[in-house]
């Protein structure tokens, strides 16, 4: 299990991660999504002890990373495949990792076969394509037969066949009781792979839960002949929205606080006529992601523009 509680980090007094709490259960794959600069990588680095949080805690199997006697046996991680020594061979890279983890080096041959780079095992990592380095990085994460995996953009450089292979590997790992936390910018791949989802925007979690629940009618479309008045009413009620198709506004309903009944009440209280109020038809994770991470609470004038 991987958990964080109110993780917070600032650089030069600028917050980059704000009170991030998440829980990744054994037997599940959790997708960690956010735009570039949203705080994903910093959060992952805090979980594995590479960055010290200003506040908050992170644990893996009930312990902080620095308290784990042999971390590689508990959690495997791939944060930057390009960081591997370019002058070593693939086999040498894994052999060193196995020895550091106090693992039988015979496991190296199994992992080379598992990730599909046995034929290139004697080649220097510096000659590997990005996809091959990603495969090697995944093998390195698995060296200690860990209970959890933390992967930052593991599909980078993989071709469609490689992505399908990775999906199968992670699903098998989770089905055997492992915990997987992965970040990715490939939304369709996260939708095909993950069971749970955590979305971060501007350093803060904006949605978390089972993927199928979050995708089920996660937004509400509302429209009025007077979009400026409608936007002002939502703004006054502290309800975030983004401009939708035409003059419609789209409201995030994934958290359960905002419902169609609530929106109808806001319109009634502000004497705004509504001509449309409906759950939107989800177009999958892409629509959900952009509705959650788009600029929130725009001014009424911006919404009407």
Language-model regions, residue ranges each:
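ABC transporter nucleotide-binding domain
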Residues: 166-254
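ATP/adenylate-binding site constellation spanning eukaryotic-like Ser/Thr protein kinases
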Residues: 62, 72, 90, 202, ...
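Conserved NTP-handling cores and scaffolds of large molecular machines
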Residues: 101, 238, 293-297
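ABC transporter nucleotide-binding domains
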Residues: 2-201, 207
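C-terminal coupling/interaction segments
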Residues: 255-305
């Amino acid at each position: 299990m991987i958990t964080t509680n109110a993780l917070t980090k600032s650089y030069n007094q600028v917050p980059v991660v704000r009170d991030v709490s998440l829980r990744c259960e054994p037997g599940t794959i959790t997708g960690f999504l956010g735009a570039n600069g949203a705080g994903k990588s910093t959060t992952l680095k805090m979980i594995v002890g590479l960055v010290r949080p200003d506040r908050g805690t992170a644990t893996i199997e009930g312990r902080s990373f620095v308290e784990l006697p042999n971390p590689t046996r508990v959690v495997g991680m791939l944060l930057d495949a390009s960081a591997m020594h370019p002058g070593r061979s693939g086999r040498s890279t894994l052999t060193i990792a196995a020895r550091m983890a106090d693992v039988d080096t015979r496991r190296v041959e199994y992992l080379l076969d598992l990730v599909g780079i046995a034929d290139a095992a004697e080649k220097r990592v510096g000659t590997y394509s990005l996809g091959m380095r990603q495969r090697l990085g995944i093998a390195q994460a698995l060296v200690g037969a860990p209970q959890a995996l933390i992967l930052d953009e593991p599909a980078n450089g993989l071709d469609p066949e490689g992505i399908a292979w990775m999906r199968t590997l992670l699903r098998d790992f989770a089905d055997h009781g492992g915990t997987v936390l992965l970040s990715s910018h490939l939304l369709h791949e996260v939708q095909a792979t993950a069971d749970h989802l955590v979305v971060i925007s501007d350093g803060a979690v904006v949605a978390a839960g089972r993927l199928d629940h979050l995708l089920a009618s996660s937004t509400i479309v509302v429209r009025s002949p007077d979009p400026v008045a409608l936007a002002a009413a939502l703004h006054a009620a502290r309800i975030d929205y983004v401009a939708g198709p035409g003059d419609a506004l789209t409201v995030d309903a994934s958290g359960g606080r905002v419902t169609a009944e609530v929106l109808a009440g806001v319109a009634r209280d502000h004497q705004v006529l509504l001509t449309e109020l409906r759950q939107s038809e989800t177009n999958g994770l892409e629509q959900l992601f952009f509705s959650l991470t788009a600029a929130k609470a725009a001014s009424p004038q911006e919404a009407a523009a």
